[in-house]
Amino acid sequence: MVYLLCPALLLLMSGCESEVFLSGQPEEGNSSDGKVRVEIFARANTYPLPLTKGLEDENTVGMAPWVLVFKGNDANATFIEAAQAFELAGKRYVILTRQPAGSNYRLLILANPQQFFYYGDAVTAYSFTSENFRLNMTPEVTTLSDICSRLLTEPLNAPSCTVIPYSGAGELIPMSYLLTVDKIDNTTKIENTDKSSLQLVRAVAKMVITNKAPNFEFPRL
């Protein structure tokens, strides 16, 4: 059995971050300067096949994903804010600005982010900081579609034919999920409507090829 892991270009989406400090987190059920604490329920989407040989861990979801908030129903939804989640008592939380009912909001969850992102090209690398997000995106102007087409993951440092992406020690696969909610307040939870955890989508595609012939070779994709 031969396992191939093909890197796919992940269109990450991001925006201005409200930096969160543990000392300033509002208690559950309360607000601080219009902010609310929202719990995140998420896990990696399950493969129906065995784990890929060579990967340290292809199912782990880190405890500090980014959550990007957009107002609207579709790709033209406009960016509101972005914040990085934090771990508290073994759970994931994120501090978001309260948003009233009456409109739809799209939450883009970006888990296991890399050290850098690229915006518009693969030349200039930006670390994940609020300042760098503000250099590239404008609240209430930049759309979900804009970010989909411009914000990218780090390019591979070596040809994928010789190095399996995200196979290094402690190197987690970037994952994402797009969720729609009708408000953001202290009752909001980032989960499915049936209360189950979101099944995040990995930034790479996995192909499993089975051939029992002793002389089988798979030349390329």
For the regions a protein language model found, what residue spans apply to each?
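Sec-type signal peptide cleavage vicinity
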Residues: C16-L221
